[in-house]
């Protein structure tokens, strides 16, 4: 099979034969997806409605919650539709679109955490200049960069994938994966390999490095401040540190599953680990921030009470 026109769809082989369990899996996934949409939407509305939350940190959180909805929408509808498919086929355009969208969402997540880490750095290390540095224009610029940087990076990376000719169509996963798609190509140029490495560097290594630098600067200040200020710093920084750690673990699972031989791991465990990021993060993020940050916790309680 040397002609790329013969490959019109990819087969998601990780589903296997789930039999009657498809109804249980579908119900659980639908419930989880609706829960993710509800929780994140409520927090978005709370931040939008409550003027007390119109501060840099909460505006940046607004982007994070919106991205959780986008990432979940990129995954769950397709996965749920595949539950009732006998062939588990996905057309090339849809597969490319899902991969592109998922990679954008992962990058937006990291960029949002970078912006929030910078916000915490200014608030803790330069408190007297916080209102000057984190003004409305600066927050607006950060919000635009959070979305534009991933979009431009992904366009650049996928411009090398779309023209590829494919000699295989079986993807051993429950969703479309960028690296596994490239592996199915009849031939991969050095440019494709370099673009993949550059994409990983620009969307993962650089953001993680910036987050690490921010918290390395925050830590000495927290250690040399009063107990009250230290407690405030811990309260606002803990959800971000947990989010970054969870994201890091999820990315390790994702890339390990795509790039290494994991034959010793059972299929169910492997599927769960590859989905860890897209299952836990969309719900974990709103729970952590909605519960740990006092202002948001008070606001959504007032919001729910007023509705009732």
Positions of the model-derived regions?
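Transmembrane helical core of 7TM receptor-like proteins
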Residues: 1-308
């Amino acid at each position: 099979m040397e002609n790329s026109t013969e490959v019109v769809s990819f087969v998601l082989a990780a589903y296997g034969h789930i039999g009657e369990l498809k109804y249980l899996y579908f119900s659980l996934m639908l419930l989880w997806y609706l829960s993710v949409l509800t929780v994140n939407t409520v927090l978005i509305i709370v931040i939008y409605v409550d003027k007390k939350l119109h501060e840099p940190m909460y505006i940046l959180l607004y982007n994070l919650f919106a991205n959780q909805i986008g990432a979940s929408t990129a995954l769950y509808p397709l996965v749920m539709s595949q539950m009732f498919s006998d062939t588990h086929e996905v057309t090339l355009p849809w597969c490319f679109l899902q991969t592109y969208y998922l990679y954008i969402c992962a990058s937006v997540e990291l960029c949002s955490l970078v912006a929030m880490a910078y916000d915490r750095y200014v608030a803790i290390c330069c408190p007297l200049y916080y209102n000057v540095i984190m003004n409305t224009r600066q927050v607006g610029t950060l919000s635009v960069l959070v979305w534009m940087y991933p979009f431009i990076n992904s366009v650049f990376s996928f411009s090398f994938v779309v023209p590829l000719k494919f000699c295989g169509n079986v993807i051993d996963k429950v969703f479309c994966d960028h690296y596994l798609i490239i592996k199915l190509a009849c031939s991969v140029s050095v440019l494709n390999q370099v673009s993949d490495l550059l994409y990983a560097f620009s969307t993962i290594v650089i953001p993680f490095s910036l987050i690490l630098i921010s918290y390395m600067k925050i830590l000495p200040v927290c250690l040399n401040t009063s107990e009250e200020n230290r407690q405030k710093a811990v309260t606002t920084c803990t959800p971000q540190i947990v989010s970054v750690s969870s994201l890091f673990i999820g990315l390790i699972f994702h890339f390990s599953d795509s790039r290494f031989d994991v034959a010793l791991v059972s299929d169910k465990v492997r599927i769960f680990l590859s989905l860890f990021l897209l299952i836990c993060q969309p719900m974990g993020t709103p729970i952590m921030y909605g519960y740990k940050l006092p202002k948001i916790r008070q606001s959504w309680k007032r919001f729910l009470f007023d509705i009732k």
